[in-house]
Design a protein with these regions (language model features):
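Generic structural signal for well-ordered alpha-helical scaffold segments
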Residues: 3, 41-44, 172
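N-terminal small/polar loop signature for handling phosphorylated ligands or for N-terminal nucleophile
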Residues: 1-23
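Phosphate-binding and adjacent anionic-ligand microenvironments
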Residues: 9, 46-173
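Short, structured secondary-structure boundary patches
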Residues: 1-4, 32-34, 95-101
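Anionic group-transfer/hydrolysis microenvironments
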Residues: 14-16, 26, 59, 101
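Short acidic-hydrophobic sequence patches enriched in Asp/Glu that either
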Residues: 31-39, 60, 118
């Protein structure tokens, strides 16, 4: 629709509008990871990103972390769930966190995801930087990603297993 109507940006919300996914001028989906990067970088440049840190979950894409590293933006990972993201933000005084799913929390304004607030901040970034959403998102190279649950009988043993740790590190490199 965005591409067909030659719009600059589009927004999609879930049923209660606590999640927001954007669509750029080329019809590309801009998920929560990209939104975190775009908003985090903007707030950091303005000196408004507490600790220059965003809070993400373990499901975030490696490309987000590499892009953050490149610009000096820090990040903390939590378990999946906006509850855990918010707990970390509250504990450490961070103001921006979220999930790939589009749950984005701006703790100065809300304690949970707010899709309308998210879309307003995205619009602020686009207008203030005078750049398209596609250009802003283009700084992040999203890597192929497979999310798969693996059942184990003892999570602690699996996590501490050297072979598992080596495989995870190899995949991250």
């Amino acid at each position: 629709f965005v591409k067909e109507k030659k719009l600059d940006v589009g927004f999609a919300y879930d049923g209660d509008a606590d999640r927001c996914i954007a669509v750029d001028e080329n019809g590309k989906v801009i998920d929560g990871d990209l939104i975190l990067y775009i908003c985090g970088k903007y707030l950091m440049e303005q000196g408004r990103l507490e600790g220059n840190t965003i809070v993400t979950t373990v499901m975030s894409n490696l490309g987000l972390y590499k892009a953050c590293d490149k610009i000096g933006m820090k990040y903390e990972q939590t378990a999946v769930g906006d509850k855990y993201v918010y707990e970390n933000m509250l504990k450490n005084g961070y103001i921006l966190g979220g999930e790939q799913s589009g749950h984005i929390i701006f703790s100065k304004h809300a304690r949970t995801g707010d899709g309308i607030l998210t879309s307003l901040l995205i619009m602020e970034v686009i207008l203030e930087k005078k750049q398209s959403l596609g250009t802003l998102a283009g700084e992040v190279k999203i890597y192929p990603q497979l999310l798969k649950n693996v059942r184990v009988t003892d999570k602690k043993t699996a996590r501490e297993n050297p072979a598992v740790q080596e495989a995870v590190q190899k995949a991250a490199d």
